[in-house]
Amino acid sequence: MFEVGEKYPVESSSSSNDIESRGVQPITSLKDNKSIGMIEKDNDDLSCEQYSTCDEVKRDLKARHVSMIAIGGTIGTGLFISTGSLLHTTGPVMSLISFLFVTTLAYSVTQSLGEMTTYIPVSGSFAQFITRWVSKSCGAANGWLYWFSWAITFALELSVVGQVIQYWTDAVPLAGWISIFFVLLTTFNLFPVKYYGEVEFWIASTKVIAIVGWLIYAFCMVCGAGKTGPVGFRYWRNGYAWGDGMIVSNNGKYAISFINGLINAVFTFQGTELVAVTAGEASPRAIRSAIKKVMFRILVFYVLCMLFIGLLVPYNDPKLTQDGGFTRNSPFLIAMENSGTKVLPHIFNAVIVTTIISAGNSNVYSGSRILYGLAQAGVAPKFFLKTNKGGVPYFAVLFTAAFGALGYLACSEDGNKAFTWLLNIIATAGLIAWGFISVSHVRFMNVLRKRGLSRDILPYKAFFMPYSAYYAIIIIFIVVLIQGFTVFWDFNASDFFTAYISVILFVVLWIGFHFFFYGFGKDSFKWENILIPLDDCDIDSGVRDINDAEFDVPEPKNVWERFWLLIA
């Protein structure tokens, strides 16, 4: 069996603590293929000028932090707000089908990440996996697009939080709320990551408790505890099961509704891959623990919520679209109001506000770490590597947060249209990232096979591999290709760019970086520069022996601790 430091010597276990104290693991520069992420133990005479990453992030996140960051980044606007748009457009049945379908994709992608990230835990890791095992230009393009999606998501969260607060009062203008949270979240992300992790843990814990409580409440209402009596599947009968869709014919309506539902659901699920982004600041075992619980969290926090929303709120409920549209009317609140509960909607709206703030916090954190990883790889300006005393890449934080200014688009008369525009860009960019995560994993497994190495060497072995990776690649390619095809029936330039701008941006970045690396000569079109040969794929740099990582898993002493061990 392959042992780290023997057949492919990269890092001996004896030096793991030295390396861990410095931050992220070594990465290969895209431009010169030199290690730029680590100062070797035997090279103490090397100066910081020779290694531009002397400023490094710190590995201060614990297992519960990592798991809750993944939850905190995903439970936000997508679940609490955009599910209303999904329900109205597609109906309860197609909404649930869309969620179940995207669940299979999210599970496949996170399992692929689990195998790669626990083996090579580096900050912003999956963009670097694409760089190592697909192509340098593809990795750079994907990394920038993925960063862009999180920067835009921050703008979307800012655009929504003020509108949710306006559920209570319009005394403060929307621009005022956007400005307040813009400054607060940007400032908070400049504090050391251990504070971020601890605050995010407790905020995300509030989300978890609130959702579990809402599910219990919803179950009681469906069974007849509310003023409407037993609801059951009332809104799944008599034409309520399917939304209006976009066209009249039934077959076409179902197909279009399903595609629209997928895009909306992908936006809701985006962030399940955040465990990989935190890899540079967490124990590898913490990553492994978080990956194992992805399916449980998805089923509880997404699928069950969508099921009960569809049971309690009819797709044509006027509250879904009145008074500002979907962004001000969460289906969670509508379900409570329809059941006759007076005070609980206000309490839960406070939870939603906290949730969106937390999600925005995670957006800036994730985007800044992705940008930091891009700078390490040599495809972003070097000043993004600068960190403060707390190990925070402050230039990366500020640049990522600056895109929050797009949140002011919500102040225009077409605020809801801007929300939909941002949502589609984010969802498509997220799908592209998911697709290349799966492509990277297929290449990773091929390299292992080429070297004669068994998957038994991996700290985490996923189920249904490699079949689920191929499944994700095929489905994602099809969805990205057809998700905007209705614009061609009655072509509109604005709708076209809304649907495909992420695809266009990715292609432009890919081509641009390809010529940046290889120029315009004959070498540019050599196959080995388009797709890295398996023999040249680097699966050695950054490898860690997971058994050497310090990680304590305390035994749960009571029911409460068992609950948190299950969740986080």
Curated annotation (Swiss-Prot):
Induction entry: Expression is negatively regulated by the transcriptional repressors NRG1 and TUP1. Expression is also regulated by SSN6. Expression is repressed by HAP43. Expression is induced by antifungal agents caspofungin and flucytosine. Finally, expression is also induced during biofilm development.
GO terms for cellular component: membrane; plasma membrane
TM region(s), chain numbering: 66-86, 89-109, 145-165, 171-191, 201-221, 255-275, 294-314, 340-360, 390-410, 419-439, 469-489, 501-521
One annotated GO molecular function: amino acid transmembrane transporter activity
InterPro entries on file: AA-permease/SLC12A_dom, Amino_acid_permease_CS, APC_YAT
Record's bilayer topology term: Multi-pass membrane protein
Keywords, alphabetical: Amino-acid transport, Cell membrane, Glycoprotein, Membrane, Transmembrane, Transmembrane helix, Transport
Region (Disordered): 1-24
Subcellular location per the Swiss-Prot or TrEMBL entry: Cell membrane
Glycosylated residues (UniProt): N33, N492
Pfam families listed in its UniProt record: AA_permease (PF00324)
GO biological process, one term: amino acid transmembrane transport
Family: Belongs to the amino acid-polyamine-organocation (APC) superfamily. YAT (TC 2.A.3.10) family.
Role according to the record: Probable permease for arginine and lysine.
PANTHER family reported in the protein's UniProt record: AMINO ACID PERMEASE, ARGININE PERMEASE CAN1-RELATED
Protein name, as recorded: Probable lysine/arginine permease CAN2
Recorded name of the encoding gene: CAN2
